[in-house]
Amino acid sequence: MSFEELRVIIVVYSSALIPLIYLLYSYKKLPPWVPLIYITAFIACALGWEVWFTYGLVDGDAVDLRRSAVLSSWIPLHLNWFLNSLADAGTVTLGGFWLMWRMCSKDNQIFSSWSWKAFGVFYIWCICQNIFVELFLYHDQLADGKLLSWAPLAPLGSYLNPELFSFNGGSVMLQTQIPWIILPAVIYAAVIKYSNSQLIKST
């Protein structure tokens, strides 16, 4: 096992499990929308692209064909989409909302009415983390020439997938960025809707 493979394994498992453990431990202290949004984001990411990319369901290669045997043994095929979706829901989504809250002076009002500043923070976080993942974590299995499946939240598939830019030998492709271009606004709107529905119930 190389150091890079070890790094990928540690990051994948920690980004998937640490937020889940924290959520299970602290859910009574958190706003009621947090667990619901976590589950909603998990389902959206799993069905939106993670399952499709993992198994190569439509004109794509399964993840085992796009990475080393070591990674496939430590992150099995049938666990890959699950771990990635946990990380999407926890580290990316809930982590992004925590960062958004901190950057907006801990103003809880951003979760009950739309704030462009708050959304901007959340959107930039989602895009930047995805670029980081593509360049430094999954750069080998997402590299140019590795075919990813069409997916509902990556509707252009590999059919229209230009390279957006490259850095340090890694490439950022359009197909892998589209899900996090689409999803942040939907998730933020869902938080506001659910938060307001809870306020109505409590009055």
Describe the predicted segments one by one.
Residues 1-203:
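Aromatic-rich, lipid-facing transmembrane alpha helices and their immediate juxtamembrane interface loops
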